[in-house]
Amino acid sequence: MAGFGAMEKFLVEYKSAVEKKLAEYKCNTNTAIELKLVRFPEDLENDIRTFFPEYTHQLFGDDETAFGYKGLKILLYYIAGSLSTMFRVEYASKVDENFDCVEADDVEGKIRQIIPPGFCTNTNDFLSLLEKEVDFKPFGTLLHTYSVLSPTGGENFTFQIYKADMTCRGFREYHERLQTFLMWFIETASFIDVDDERWHYFLVFEKYNKDGATLFATVGYMTVYNYYVYPDKTRPRVSQMLILTPFQGQGHGAQLLETVHRYYTEFPTVLDITAEDPSKSYVKLRDFVLVKLCQDLPCFSREKLMQGFNEDMVIEAQQKFKINKQHARRVYEILRLLVTDMSDAEQYRSYRLDIKRRLISPYKKKQRDLAKMRKCLRPEELTNQMNQIEISMQHEQLEESFQELVEDYRRVIERLAQE
């Protein structure tokens, strides 16, 4: 028995040692993948230019790790405009294939699943492509030009927004490179069917000078799908929107979304613009853009706002900027908050009740449906009692929802004040 115990202890210790050794060969792919947008040769050695993915689970699993390497680096460097790519895997050491019958993950194979062929693997070839970048020009039709002041002041950076499609020469290949960023920055990203002509593409570029020549750098993009609405309308739906990390926080998302709305206003057949599974950050962005667009419309004057939400607001928002009724209501609520004196008890009460009436509508419907079902299953007294409990819970949830909404609306108003 003593011998058996010693053997068991040895096995436990051996297993622990093996697990510890294997753990040394696990790498977090969110930090192992290094992304870079290259404009100048010196950018290759400049760590300030490096940025990292937010998500890698679609290629490397829920734990977002790669096994089998120490000091793993997955280099994905892109020339800033054309997005010509250099892909290389580097590491300090790799697990021995004979080590306890384990083998390293095929990191290169996983990355090849999403990046198109034709990439470089060495620096010299990449620098040769960089020298030809002066020939790269944006695709499609120029829609909008705007400037952003340098954070240090004294210099304006110029940006342009273009609309493109797959008939533009070279755009299909460019888009294949561009869409790879989705996997790193959108949690549920997937690639679209580019052969479907209903897709529209909106691209943001920075226009800059290099050695006396004008060049362009990719900033971000949006894809929009045009759904058919019976009998003769379309409803553009925003599917994907991404501003690359080095350009975030500079207002490009707002410029892009506003430009898209203004573009579609020119088409009488467009009913309104929606979004596919919008994130919280997208909803905040949309709130800001739509309020900015609508704030000077006559139907959203202070006098009209204080009288409550009405059909004129719905019609004018739809006709002027392709905004649907639900979004027009949010615009009204934000602008109503802007003109409401919250220190005035009567104005505050009127605003609070107006918002809560809208918030409680689905609760009331749910309660009516629930009451009908329970009458078939339980005595009336018990049903009434349970309904009272639900009403109490609804009031708490309603107040919480109201306060959260007001907080979100105030952030939009603060941003408007900074414009």
Swiss-Prot record:
Q: Which residues carry this modification: Phosphoserine?
A: S190, S343
| Pfam (any one) | Hat1_N
Summarize induction of expression: By viruses and interferons. Up-regulated also by estrogen.
Q: How is the protein modified post-translationally, according to the record?
A: Phosphorylated by AMPK at Ser-190; phosphorylation increases HAT1 activity.
What does altering S190A do? Complete loss of activity after pulsatile shear stress
Site-annotated residues for Interaction with histone H4 N-terminus: W199
* Binding annotation for acetyl-CoA: M241, L242, I243, Q248, G249, Q250, G251, H252, G253, A254
Broad class of enzyme this protein falls into: transferase
Q: Could you mention a single GO BP entry for this protein?
A: chromosome organization
One MF annotation (Gene Ontology) recorded for this entry = histone H4K12 acetyltransferase activity
- GO terms for cellular component: chromatin; chromosome, telomeric region; mitochondrion; nuclear matrix; nucleoplasm; nucleus; protein-containing complex
N6-acetyllysine modifications at: K9, K15
Q: Where is this region: Interaction with histone H4 N-terminus?
A: 62-64, 225-227
Iron keyword on record:
no
**EC number(s) of the enzyme?**
2.3.1.48
Keyword Acyltransferase (UniProt): yes
| Function, in words | Histone acetyltransferase that plays a role in different biological processes including cell cycle progression, glucose metabolism, histone production or DNA damage repair. Coordinates histone production and acetylation via H4 promoter binding. Acetylates histone H4 at 'Lys-5' (H4K5ac) and 'Lys-12' (H4K12ac) and, to a lesser extent, histone H2A at 'Lys-5' (H2AK5ac). Drives H4 production by chromatin binding to support chromatin replication and acetylation. Since transcription of H4 genes is tightly coupled to S-phase, plays an important role in S-phase entry and progression. (Microbial infection) Contributes to hepatitis B virus (HBV) replication by acetylating histone H4 at the sites of 'Lys-5' and 'Lys-12' on the covalently closed circular DNA (cccDNA) minichromosome leading to its accumulation within the host cell.
Relate the assembly described in the record: Catalytic subunit of the type B histone acetyltransferase (HAT) complex, composed of RBBP7 and HAT1. Interacts with histones H4 and H2A. The interaction is dependent of the ability of RBBP7 to bind to the N-terminus of histones. Component of the histone H3.1 and H3.3 complexes.
What this protein is called in its record is Histone acetyltransferase type B catalytic subunit
Q: Which organism is it from?
A: Homo sapiens
Organism phylogeny: Eukaryota, Metazoa, Chordata, Craniata, Vertebrata
